[in-house]
């Protein structure tokens, strides 16, 4: 036994080198039944990607430009000289559509009407009746389809950058947030629930309440949360000088909204254009009423609205026209009332979240001292408390600063903010 043990120790000190059979055997360990086919597919993918890179010739760069060594300025200059500018026209009719000898009637503004054919680079399926096209100046052949003409002021209403307001920044509006999410988010995220029940999802919300209760703030939170296109319209923007301009802007606004996959249109201060119709004998409000009637028609008229959600905000719902408020146009009316004690406490905590405050400040006590206050009033209290700390050259805000601010804003400004007119706004 001792001799065998010594032999094992010698083998460990002088290990035998592996031959090719041993190496091949070790390579088979850990291989699954599909290892060979996976390797084959990986090799094919590698070869195909190499082939694609060879065909492209230029790798994508951050600037979108090729390397200077691959620039061909002479041919680019020649191409720019040969390429002629196109003229804008409108295709009014298609003769013999879906055939090889299809012809197109185009109307070139202030010149004439022509019957023309298609250019070499245009597909017949790209051209429809009524759309704008680009035609050359010699044969007037259609060279390119153009997007619909939309007023730049309407295009600028689209909110490109998402606001930094979230639902957590809206205090005292728990019930209102739930109602808003049911209308805006649920149909976009889970449309199958409405299909199973066989009902159409609500498409419009009217937010009404006293000034400063968070109507526009909640709309900004909706814009932050959703991935849909968000269009913000202020009511006074649609009141134009010339007859028909406001109605045209509304038409183009909804035309742009229908071209998006999903869209939310927010009308702020809608009482500027949505007032009840009446005859004042002068006719000064006729244009505003035409604009409102165009909105009424676009919301639920002859044509379907599509996947467009409409939010409206006002603090004077009693002045709005009944045709605008009927279900189908605005399905839900969400009231933003004055926040209760719990809501005011939450609003205090939201506004002091970024402030340097002392610990153990009794926000519930401060909320009790601000009865019948809106969220805007409480924000003003927090700002005024910070001003007291700056005056005293302190780096933190104390509870006494908040109490002084409450006395100044809530008690001192009472004649401005808590008038009976605002308390019984409706």
UniProtKB/Swiss-Prot annotation:
<comment type="similarity">
    <text>Belongs to the AAA ATPase family.</text>
</comment>
<keyword id="KW-0963">Cytoplasm</keyword>
<feature type="binding site">
    <location>
        <begin position="209"/>
        <end position="216"/>
    </location>
    <ligand>
        <name>ATP</name>
    </ligand>
</feature>
<dbReference type="GO" id="GO:0016887">
    <property type="term" value="F:ATP hydrolysis activity"/>
</dbReference>
<dbReference type="Pfam" id="PF17862">
    <property type="entry name" value="AAA_lid_3"/>
</dbReference>
<dbReference type="Pfam" id="PF00004">
    <property type="entry name" value="AAA"/>
</dbReference>
<keyword id="KW-0547">Nucleotide-binding</keyword>
<dbReference type="GO" id="GO:0005524">
    <property type="term" value="F:ATP binding"/>
</dbReference>
<dbReference type="InterPro" id="IPR048723">
    <property type="entry name" value="PRS7-like_OB"/>
</dbReference>
<dbReference type="InterPro" id="IPR003593">
    <property type="entry name" value="AAA+_ATPase"/>
</dbReference>
<dbReference type="InterPro" id="IPR012340">
    <property type="entry name" value="NA-bd_OB-fold"/>
</dbReference>
<comment type="function">
    <text>The 26S proteasome is involved in the ATP-dependent degradation of ubiquitinated proteins. The regulatory (or ATPase) complex confers ATP dependency and substrate specificity to the 26S complex.</text>
</comment>
<keyword id="KW-0647">Proteasome</keyword>
<dbReference type="Pfam" id="PF21236">
    <property type="entry name" value="PRS7_OB"/>
</dbReference>
<dbReference type="InterPro" id="IPR003959">
    <property type="entry name" value="ATPase_AAA_core"/>
</dbReference>
<dbReference type="GO" id="GO:0043161">
    <property type="term" value="P:proteasome-mediated ubiquitin-dependent protein catabolic process"/>
</dbReference>
<dbReference type="InterPro" id="IPR041569">
    <property type="entry name" value="AAA_lid_3"/>
</dbReference>
<dbReference type="GO" id="GO:0005634">
    <property type="term" value="C:nucleus"/>
</dbReference>
<keyword id="KW-0067">ATP-binding</keyword>
<dbReference type="InterPro" id="IPR050221">
    <property type="entry name" value="26S_Proteasome_ATPase"/>
</dbReference>
<dbReference type="GO" id="GO:0036402">
    <property type="term" value="F:proteasome-activating activity"/>
</dbReference>
<dbReference type="GO" id="GO:0005737">
    <property type="term" value="C:cytoplasm"/>
</dbReference>
<dbReference type="InterPro" id="IPR003960">
    <property type="entry name" value="ATPase_AAA_CS"/>
</dbReference>
<protein>
    <recommendedName>
        <fullName>26S proteasome regulatory subunit 7</fullName>
    </recommendedName>
</protein>
<keyword id="KW-0539">Nucleus</keyword>
<dbReference type="GO" id="GO:0008540">
    <property type="term" value="C:proteasome regulatory particle, base subcomplex"/>
</dbReference>
<dbReference type="InterPro" id="IPR027417">
    <property type="entry name" value="P-loop_NTPase"/>
</dbReference>
């Amino acid at each position: 036994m001792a001799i065998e043990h010594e032999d094992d120790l010698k083998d460990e000190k002088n290990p035998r080198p592996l031959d090719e059979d041993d190496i091949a055997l070790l390579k088979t360990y850990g291989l699954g039944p599909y290892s060979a086919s996976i390797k084959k597919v990986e090799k094919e993918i590698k070869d195909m990607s190499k082939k694609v890179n060879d065909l492209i010739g230029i790798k994508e760069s951050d600037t979108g430009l090729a390397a200077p060594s691959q620039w061909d300025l002479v041919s680019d200059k020649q191409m720019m000289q040969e390429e002629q500018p196109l003229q804008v026209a409108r295709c009014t009719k298609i003769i013999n559509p879906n055939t090889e000898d299809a012809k197109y009637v185009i109307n070139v503004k202030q010149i004439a009407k022509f019957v023309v054919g298609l250019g070499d680079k245009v597909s017949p399926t790209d051209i429809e009746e009524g759309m704008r096209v680009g035609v050359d100046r010699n044969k007037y052949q259609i060279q390119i389809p153009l997007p619909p003409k939309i007023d730049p002021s309407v295009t600028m209403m689209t909110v490109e950058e998402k606001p930094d307001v979230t639902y957590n920044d809206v205090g005292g509006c728990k019930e209102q947030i739930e109602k808003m999410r049911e209308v805006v988010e649920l149909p976009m995220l889970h449309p199958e629930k409405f299909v199973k029940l066989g009902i159409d999802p609500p498409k419009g919300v009217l937010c009404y309440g006293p000034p400063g209760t968070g109507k526009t703030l909640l709309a900004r939170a909706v814009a932050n949360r959703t991935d849909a296109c968000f269009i913000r319209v202020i009511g006074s923007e649609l009141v134009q000088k010339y007859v028909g301009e406001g109605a045209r802007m509304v038409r183009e606004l909804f035309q742009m909204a229908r071209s998006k996959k999903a869209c939310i249109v927010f009308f702020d201060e809608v009482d500027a254009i949505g007032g009840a119709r009446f005859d004042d004998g002068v006719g000064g409000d006729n244009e505003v009423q035409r604009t409102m009637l165009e909105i009424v028609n676009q919301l639920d008229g002859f044509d379907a609205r599509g996947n467009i959600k409409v939010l409206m905000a006002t603090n004077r719902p009693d002045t709005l026209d009944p045709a605008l408020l009927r279900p189908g146009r605005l399905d839900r009316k969400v009231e933003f009332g004055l926040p209760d004690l719990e809501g005011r406490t939450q609003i205090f905590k939201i506004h002091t979240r970024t402030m340097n405050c002392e610990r153990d400040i009794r926000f519930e006590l401060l909320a009790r001292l601000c009865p019948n206050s809106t969220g805007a009033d409480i924000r003003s209290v927090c700002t005024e408390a910070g001003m007291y700390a700056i005056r005293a050259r302190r780096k933190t805000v104390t509870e006494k600063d908040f109490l002084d601010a409450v006395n100044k804003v809530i008690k001192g400004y009472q004649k401005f903010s808590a008038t009976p007119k605002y308390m019984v706004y409706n």
